[in-house]
Design a protein with these regions (language model features):
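Acidic-aromatic/histidine active-site loop/patch
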Residues: 73
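Short capping motifs at secondary-structure boundaries
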Residues: 65, 80-89, 164-165
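C-terminal motif of bacterial Sec signal peptides marking the signal peptidase cleavage site
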Residues: 14-15
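Bacterial N-terminal signal peptides that target proteins for export
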Residues: 1-5
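Short, structured beta-strand segments at or near domain termini in extracellular proteins/domains
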Residues: 287-300
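C-terminal, low-complexity/hydrophilic appendages and adjacent surface loops
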Residues: 52-55
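Functional-site microenvironments in short loops/helix caps that host divalent-cation chemistry
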Residues: 20-24, 37-38, 44, 49, ...
Length: 303
């Protein structure tokens, strides 16, 4: 990322199992990489008029493709790093820019911050924040192999995709898959009102009721899959797509992220929907952005 633009964009970053009970700490998640085939088709992409950037709705057709059943995990990304020695954007030395705050002259990344009178920022730059330490050096992913990897910039996701021979989904592929064959998805709750995705319940950002069993990221696969057999397309972490976008305040090129995260709440942004989209600087990861991949080169299953 061109980090001189980070201070301007910091406030504008995206904020946003067993069905019988919240999974809670009992769920260890899914391990190993698996893909499912999603047959092509036409659907109405987008939404409106609540969020201008999601509309107008339009009919889009996608060809069949393979897609990861879950977000890329810490364990999967660790295997990539071990094999290649890859360093993520957050681990690299930033440019030595004049007048930059000292903390932005060392490797680090953006971490969510609950605003207060003493510190009204929604996001802060934390030295040492990277995929092994998502919120800074005091947090470790040890013992969290099956959680989605975060603090991943677009370039990092692309590098992983090239290594495994896959690609990031287009926005249309992602949204078609997220809908799971259903044109209009209801609120992600069961008949008794219990959450069926990892998003923020309560008054964001001051009171998290934790009804879904998670304050932060959940291991992948702890909630019921959608109609295509895909987990966590809604909530948990935002996911990169290959689609570029535009944001007037951005200091560099942006791409579209989809799906919402554990920070999305009904009272604040309600972005835990297939049509939701945000525009994220390619060079900047955060502690609530991850990714999954598709494969359009591999032939579909024999009919």
């Amino acid at each position: 990322m061109q980090r001189f633009g980070f201070a301007l964009g910091l406030m504008l970053l995206s904020g946003c199992s067993d069905a019988s009970a919240p999974p809670g700490a009992m769920c260890t998640g899914l391990s190993g990489s698996k893909m499912v085939w999603v047959s092509g088709g036409s659907f109405v992409m987008g939404d409106g008029p609540q969020y201008d950037e999601e509309g107008p709705p339009q009919t889009v057709t996608v060809q069949g493709f393979w897609i990861d059943t879950h977000e890329v995990t810490n364990a999967e990304f660790a295997a990539f790093v071990k094999a290649t020695g890859y360093k993520t954007m957050a681990e690299r030395d930033p440019p030595k820019l004049p007048n930059a705050p000292p903390e932005m002259l060392v490797p680090g990344s953006a971490v969510f911050n609950i605003p207060s009178d003493a510190d009204p920022r929604w996001w802060r730059w934390v030295p040492g924040a990277q995929w092994r330490h998502p919120s800074g050096l005091k947090e470790s992913i040890v013992g969290r192999d099956n959680e989605p990897v975060v603090q991943i910039a677009y370039q990092d996701a692309e590098a992983y995709a090239q290594w495994v021979g896959k690609e990031l989904p287009s926005e249309a592929q992602w949204e078609y898959a997220a809908r799971g064959g259903v044109a209009a998805l209801p609120e992600p709750v069961d008949a008794n009102g219990r959450p069926q995705a990892n998003y923020y319940q309560g008054a964001f950002p001051v009171k998290n009721l934790n009804t879904d069993g998670y304050v932060g990221r959940a291991p992948v696969g702890c909630f019921k899959p959608n109609g295509f057999g895909l987990y966590d397309m809604i909530g948990n972490v935002w996911e990169w797509t290959s689609a570029s976008g535009a944001r007037a305040d951005a200091s560099e090129a942006v791409n579209i992220i989809k799906g919402g995260s554990y920070l999305c709440a009904a009272n604040y942004c309600a972005r835990y929907r297939p049509a939701a989209r945000q525009f994220q600087e390619r060079g900047l990861g955060t502690d609530h952005i991850g990714f999954r991949l598709v494969d359009t080169k591999k032939a579909g299953p024999a009919s």
